[in-house]
């Protein structure tokens, strides 16, 4: 029965179809068919030939197997051949069977192998046995994995599926066809499942992409980090290497800096041997070259000095003059000495490791070879006892005399150079039996001081003052004609004017006071003294030996030793060439100090300088205070007019203005007082206006009452004699007792004025002095306050003025007040003065070898001042309390000054103390026309560089020859000759149409001021003593005006003016 059912199922087409579909589902998933399904399918496709052969395919109803048709025969043959071949699946089964048989045979062989074989072979056989036993498991796993992979690859996208094989119910029966509800539910479920599967696959793909990207980016970041780490490690290595190199160089620099500091300390302490040792250790070729060159210079100088000494000892003057050509060979150091001497020096240098001090030793030994101790002062000195440093100065001058050399006594001002000189003359007279004659040259202002000092200290020495009128000088010449005198004292003008008489005398010593006047070797005075007089020895006295260039230093050395220092060019090359060859444009501090040190050693044997701080430790101190003040509206107006158009409004009644030249001087006049521009017809004796019109006068009006009440006495210095006239008016209006001394004061009156001011109970509160006439050689220790009304371009002039009070004999603290207008040209002058004062510690300025500071620089400085105009005037004006704090010496004085200011403010009802803009006179304003603008443009063309004009010469119009002829002739005064020459030159220039204008530089201004002072001194001698009073501002005849409030006698100006103010 079962067998019948099986046969029935096998013959049922529906069952066969189901079996085929199930087999197809398995095969689509690449799965193995179950055995019963495989048997069913095999029974369907692999029927026996016998079952199939009887039923060939029918070809219609009339089928005949042997019909003879060609096509029919071919089809039959093809069908017969197909039945003889095996199917693909059958071949696969046969192949699989063969593999299984082989595996089975191999397993049998491996299991039957004996166990006594080698271990390696036994291990291989066991591995192969285990692998063959796992073959079925391996095939099954591989089939499942392959099926899943194929399904994922081909069935992930529903659109790519030809048929939903996964929904086939493999072992189940199908539902009835036509059940729409079931089919729809099936479709919905299938769509949902497909959507979920697609979403899951998309999520997995997205995660895979993100994972891949993260992995890639992580690899990139890791590579970047690794690269950065490598770079950082490389940088660290480079930094460590660079730090090591910098540390090494830093140590080298520190070592070099320490060595340089040690060398500089050795230079400052003047330890030459230590410095030379350190210089050799440094191996600095530049320094070594300079030291070698300067050593050669010292060797040559020492040889020349010794040769000059030998020539003088032989007393063969002709031989000395004839050997000038030989002595000029000093310029070439190796040609000065004989060949034998050069060889000796070279061998010594080689033996002593190139001793760089040998030349300096020879130089010093050649000069001060004869030594003489001076332990006490000469008995001829009766006026007092010399101080220890003055005895040392006397011994130094005696050493110069014994060695037959000249020198410079350059002690600081106030240390008694005059007394030391008198002590030298007395010592020579007493110990050397040298009676003279000696010639003393000094500025005209200090001649009475020399006469008084001789009378006080050495009355037994016959000293004559050679000065005065022609008749008086003739009388003096008659008295000294027989040579019965020891000393003749005169000034610079007479040494040239009376040269015909004075050059006939053989002078033993010529002593030049204020010897810095000879810093220009081309001046008439230097030429006259160098060629026209017979002088055995020379001595220069100066408190300011500071020179600004090698040329000025050489001028002094040339005057002292003309046969040794005979060429300025070679002298400059000695110190310029070593550094020029090294190609260095600027010098280091050590090189600069070394040059200065070597120059010091050149001039040291011939120069002696001591400072007050070194020798006078108990001398009261000196304090300089800069008092800055504002300018009045009138001053600011004039200052603006000068800087804008170069002209100012005048009190002429017609509204005209005056064109100005020398703008630097005009700006300084604006800072001092506007009255310096007005004419003589203007009433200047108005007490409130003269104070309120000037900021400096307003400051003085507050300062002077305080100083007088505190018991101080004042020296006031100014460079303008017209300003001193205004100060006289102010002092007279305020009942201050004063004296006055300037270039026009006669020589005999100067001593009287000094004596009146220095008396113990002198009633005079103030002494008015011009900076250049009153700042030289005067002893005014009774004053303890100095007011510099307007600073000089040359700070040494102000220094000279300050030391009139700060000198030996001063018992009080000296306070110096420098008045400066805020924001004006005076601040520039003060700054330049500070720069120049920096030279004092070096003797020669730092810019010695770079002389680029020319007139062009000064012109640019003035151009900057002019362009700035009045923009900075009146800024940061100090308060009254600040001024009181600066002016007071003690706390009690300060509170006294404060109380006086408060009382003054209440009395004035707190009015403004300076003139305001509405109070400025209308005529002071200028109407700027087109012509004025054109003239102003042309006037400032030299400043802006648009026009080039000829520079006006403000020096003396006379040549040296004309000046000397004027000095020798008594018929005509030199000042008149100069004025005639100037008038002639002016006419010539006007006829040629030359109207050139120029702006003076600071050096031109200094020359002009010196010339004015010299003309004052020379012109005053020809004036009559009883002169009628004048009320004029003209300066070509007189340098000051006369006013009714003062007496008219010029000889008693100081007394008369003070007598007129004795009401207080």
UniProtKB/Swiss-Prot annotation:
Tissue: Expressed in embryos, root apical meristem (RAM) and shoot apical meristem (SAM).
Gene Ontology biological-process annotations: chromatin organization; maintenance of root meristem identity; maintenance of seed dormancy; maintenance of shoot apical meristem identity; unidimensional cell growth
Residue ranges, compositional bias (Acidic residues): 1002-1014
InterPro entries listed in its UniProt record: Helicase_ATP-bd, Helicase_C-like, P-loop_NTPase, SnAC, SNF2-like_sf, SNF2/RAD54-like_C, SNF2_N
Molecular functions per Gene Ontology: ATP binding; ATP hydrolysis activity; chromatin DNA binding; helicase activity; histone binding
Record bears the keyword ATP-binding: yes
Ranges annotated as biased composition (Low complexity): 1048-1064
Entry keyword Nucleus: yes
Domain (Helicase C-terminal) ranges: 699-866
Domain spans labelled Helicase ATP-binding: 398-563
Catalytic activity line of the entry: ATP + H2O = ADP + phosphate + H(+)
SMART domains linked: DEXDc (SM00487), HELICc (SM00490), SnAC (SM01314)
UniProt keywords, alphabetically: ATP-binding, Chromatin regulator, Developmental protein, Growth regulation, Helicase, Hydrolase, Nucleotide-binding, Nucleus
Lineage top rank: taxon: Eukaryota
Protein localization: Nucleus
A GO CC term assigned to this protein in UniProt: nucleus
Motif extent (DEAH box): 513-516
PANTHER family for the chain: SNF2/RAD54 HELICASE FAMILY
Function in brief: Probable chromatin-remodeling factor that is functionally redundant with CHR12 in root and shoot stem cell initiation and root apical meristem (RAM) and shoot apical meristem (SAM) maintenance. Can associate with the promoter region of WOX5. May promote seed maturation and repress initiation of germination. May repress plant growth.
Name the record gives this protein: Probable ATP-dependent DNA helicase CHR23
Organism: Arabidopsis thaliana
Lineage of origin: Eukaryota, Viridiplantae, Streptophyta, Embryophyta, Tracheophyta
Encoding gene (name): CHR23
């Amino acid at each position: 029965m079962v067998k019948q059912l099986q046969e029935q199922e096998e013959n049922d087409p529906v069952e066969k179809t189901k079996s085929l579909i199930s087999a197809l589902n398995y095969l689509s998933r690449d799965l193995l068919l179950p055995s019963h399904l495989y048997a069913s399918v095999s029974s369907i496709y692999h029927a026996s030939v016998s079952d199939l052969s009887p039923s060939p395919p029918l070809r219609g109803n009339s089928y005949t197997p042997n019909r003879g048709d060609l096509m029919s025969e071919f089809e039959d043959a093809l069908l017969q051949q197909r039945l003889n071949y095996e199917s693909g699946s059958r071949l696969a089964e046969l192949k699989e069977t063969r593999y299984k048989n082989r595996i089975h045979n191999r397993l049998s062989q491996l299991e039957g192998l004996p166990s006594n074989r080698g271990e390696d072979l036994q291990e291989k056989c066991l591995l192969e046995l285990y692998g063959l036993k796992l073959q079925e498991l391996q095939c099954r796993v591989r089939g499942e994995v392959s099926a899943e992979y194929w399904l994922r690859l081909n069935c992930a996208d529903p659109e790519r599926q030809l048929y939903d094989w996964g929904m086939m119910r493999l072992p189940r029966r199908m539902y009835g066809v036509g059940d729409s509800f079931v089919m729809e539910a099936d479709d919905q479920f299938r769509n949902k499942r497909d959507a979920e599967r697609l979403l899951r696959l998309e999520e997995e793909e997205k995660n895979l992409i993100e994972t891949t990207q993260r992995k890639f980016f992580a690899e990139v970041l890791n590579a970047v980090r690794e690269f950065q780490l490598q770079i950082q490690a490389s940088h660290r290595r480079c930094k460590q290497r660079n730090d090591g190199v910098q540390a090494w160089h830093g140590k080298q620099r520190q070592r070099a800096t320490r060595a340089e500091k040690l060398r500089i300390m050795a230079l400052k302490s003047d330890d030459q041997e230590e410095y030379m040792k350190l210089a050799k250790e440094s191996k600095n070729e530049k320094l070594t070259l300079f030291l070698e060159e300067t050593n050669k210079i010292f060797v040559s100088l020492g040889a020349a000095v010794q040769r000059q000494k030998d020539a003088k000892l032989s007393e063969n003057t002709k031989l000395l003059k004839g050997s000038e050509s030989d002595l000029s060979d000093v310029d070439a150091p190796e040609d000065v000495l004989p060949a034998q001497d050069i060889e000796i020096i070279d061998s010594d240098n080689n033996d002593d490791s190139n001793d760089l001090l040998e030349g300096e030793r020879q130089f010093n030994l050649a000069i001060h070879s004869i030594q003489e101790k001076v332990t006490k002062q000469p008995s001829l000195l009766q006026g007092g006892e010399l101080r220890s440093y003055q005895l040392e100065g006397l011994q130094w001058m005696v050493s110069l005399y014994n060695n037959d050399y000249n020198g410079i006594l350059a002690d600081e001002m106030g240390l008694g150079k005059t007394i030391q000189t008198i002590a030298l003359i007395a010592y020579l007279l007493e110990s050397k039996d040298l009676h003279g004659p000696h010639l003393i040259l000094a500025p005209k202002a200090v001649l009475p001081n020399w006469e008084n000092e001789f009378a006080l200290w050495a009355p037994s020495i016959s000293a004559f003052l050679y000065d005065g009128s022609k008749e008086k000088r003739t009388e003096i010449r008659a008295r000294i004609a027989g040579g019965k005198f020891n000393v003749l004292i005169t000034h610079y003008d007479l040494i040239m004017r009376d040269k015909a008489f004075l050059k006939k005398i053989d002078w033993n010593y010529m002593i030049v006071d204020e010897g810095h006047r000879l810093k220009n070797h081309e001046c008439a005075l230097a030429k006259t003294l160098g060629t026209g007089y017979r002088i055995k020895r020379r001595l220069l006295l100066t408190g300011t030996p500071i020179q600004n260039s090698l040329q000025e230093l050489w001028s002094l050395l040339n005057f002292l030793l003309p046969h040794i220092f005979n060429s300025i060019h070679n002298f400059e090359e000695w110190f310029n060439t070593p550094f020029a060859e090294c190609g260095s444009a600027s010098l280091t501090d050590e090189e600069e100090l070394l040059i200065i040190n070597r120059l010091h050693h050149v001039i040291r044997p011939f120069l002696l300088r001591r400072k007050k701080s070194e020798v006078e430790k108990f001398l009261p101190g000196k304090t300089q205070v800069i008092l800055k003040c504002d300018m009045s509206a009138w001053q600011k107006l004039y200052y603006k007019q000068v800087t804008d158009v170069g002209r100012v409004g005048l009190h002429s009644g017609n509204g005209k203005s005056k064109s100005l030249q020398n703008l630097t001087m005009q700006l300084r006049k604006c800072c001092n007082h506007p009255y310096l521009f007005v004419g003589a017809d203007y009433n200047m004796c108005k007490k409130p206006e003269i104070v309120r019109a000037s900021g400096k006068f307003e400051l003085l009006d507050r300062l002077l009452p305080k100083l007088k009440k505190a018991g101080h006495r004042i020296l006031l210095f100014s460079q303008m004699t017209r300003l001193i006239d205004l100060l006289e008016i102010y002092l007279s209006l305020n009942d201050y007792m004063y004296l006055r001394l300037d270039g026009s004061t006669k020589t005999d009156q100067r001593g009287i004025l000094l004596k009146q001011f220095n008396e113990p109970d002198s009633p005079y509160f103030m002494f008015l002095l011009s900076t250049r006439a009153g700042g030289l050689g005067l002893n005014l220790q009774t004053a303890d306050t100095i007011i510099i009304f307007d600073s000089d371009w040359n700070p040494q002039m102000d220094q000279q003025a300050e030391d009139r009070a700060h000198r030996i004999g001063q018992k009080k603290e000296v306070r110096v007040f420098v008045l400066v207008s805020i924001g004006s040209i005076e601040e520039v002058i003060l700054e330049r003065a500070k720069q120049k004062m920096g030279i004092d510690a070096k003797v020669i300025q730092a810019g010695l070898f770079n002389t680029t500071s020319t007139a062009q620089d000064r012109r640019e400085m003035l151009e900057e001042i002019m362009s700035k105009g009045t923009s900075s005037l009146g800024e940061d004006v100090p308060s009254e309390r600040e001024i009181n704090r600066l002016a007071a010496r003690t706390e009690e004085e300060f509170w006294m000054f404060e109380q006086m200011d408060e009382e003054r403010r209440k009395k004035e009802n707190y009015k403004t103390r300076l003139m305001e803009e509405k109070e400025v006179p209308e005529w002071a304003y200028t109407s700027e026309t087109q012509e004025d603008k054109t003239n102003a443009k042309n006037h400032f063309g030299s400043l802006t560089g648009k026009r080039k004009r000829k520079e006006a010469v403000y020096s003396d119009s006379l040549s040296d020859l004309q000046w000397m002829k004027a000095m020798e002739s008594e018929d005509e005064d030199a000042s008149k000759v100069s004025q005639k020459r100037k008038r002639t030159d002016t006419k010539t220039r006007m006829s040629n149409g030359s109207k050139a204008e120029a702006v003076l530089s600071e050096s031109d201004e200094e020359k002009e001021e010196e010339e004015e002072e010299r003309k004052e001194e020379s012109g005053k001698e020809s004036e009559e003593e009883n002169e009628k009073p004048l009320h004029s501002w003209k300066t070509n005849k007189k340098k000051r005006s006369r006013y009714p409030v003062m007496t008219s006698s010029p000889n008693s100006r100081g007394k008369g003016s003070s007598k007129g103010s004795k009401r207080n």
